A protein has these predicted regions:
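Residue-identity detector for glutamine
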Residues: 3, 39-42, 71
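Buried, small/hydrophobic-residue-enriched core segments of structured protein domains
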Residues: 14-61, 109-118, 122, 127-246
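Universal eukaryotic N-terminal targeting presequences
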Residues: 1-12
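Short, positively charged
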Residues: 101-109
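Low-complexity, highly charged intrinsically disordered N-terminal segments
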Residues: 46, 50-102
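Poly-acidic low-complexity segments
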Residues: 8-10, 33, 69, 102
Length: 246
């Protein structure tokens, strides 16, 4: 028995049940750019495999990137099962916009894969600090008929990853600056230094976030750096749900 608002998934061969923080009833098919709905028609005939990767652009402001955000996306969004109701609703939206829609393709996912995306995502461990231009995650289809699914999730994946990664990267730079300042200008050492450092930058970002979800992701990004001072309570809940950290 799975409780309402919970989802059961298999990861690395182990079945796990976890709770979602946000609505499990939203239509995941609307979570894409408008041009994505016609993109399946634009691939060359005979295409069976598409692999797409995400990376940070070389020449960006930061010389290193703290990568994070994937677990929240996987557990909160990609595990939402596609249903006939979602497909029918999206077909109606596409028709009103005069856009093509792969109704038969999505219905095959509903009927043949129990609503699960036929995709595989491989990625660097979250929390990794890498140079710009490093591949962070790779998405690929697991069935030759569903090569078009790879790029369909681009919008939702990038939004989930970049916001949390950006906050974490900025906070990491500040964390390291605070560490250097303490080492150079104080006599603190060991546990005393670590305790002061953890709480030098407190997160009050929840009130300025655009929505609850942004507060969770941004707050978790801040906590990824080593800082522990946070008044964004929902970020602590997210860290426990998505990363088993309390």
């Amino acid at each position: 028995h799975i409780q309402a608002g919970h989802v059961r998934v298999e990861m690395n061969g182990i079945a796990r049940e976890f709770e979602r923080m946000f609505s499990p009833n939203r239509n995941v098919l609307t979570n894409a750019d408008g041009y994505k709905y016609s993109q399946y028609l634009q691939y060359p005939e005979g295409t069976t495999y598409v692999a797409s990767y995400i990376e940070t652009r070389v020449g960006a402001k930061h010389s290193r990137i703290l990568w994070c955000g994937l677990q929240a996306f996987l557990k909160e969004t990609l595990t939402v099962r596609i249903t006939k109701k979602m497909v029918d609703k999206m077909a109606k939206i596409a028709k009103s916009a005069g856009a093509p829609f792969n109704y038969d393709g999505f219905m095959r996912i509903v009927n043949e894969f129990d609503g699960r995306w036929p995709l595989r995502i491989r990625a660097l461990p979250e929390g990794a600090v890498v140079k710009p231009g490093t591949v962070l995650a790779l998405v690929e289809n697991t069935h030759p008929d569903f090569f078009w699914c790879t790029s369909f999730i681009e919008t939702m994946l990038l939004r989930a990853a970049w916001y949390m990664t950006t906050v974490a990267t900025v906070s990491k730079d500040i964390y390291d600056l605070c560490l250097c300042t303490l080492v150079e200008f104080t006599d603190l050492k060991g546990e005393a230094l670590e305790m002061v450092l953890k709480f030098m930058l407190n997160d009050f970002g929840a009130r300025g976030a655009s929505c609850h979800e942004a507060a969770v992701l941004g707050g978790m990004g801040h906590l990824m750096t080593g800082f522990r001072g946070s008044d964004t309570t929902e970020a602590s809940e997210g860290a426990e749900l998505y990363y088993n950290h309390n």
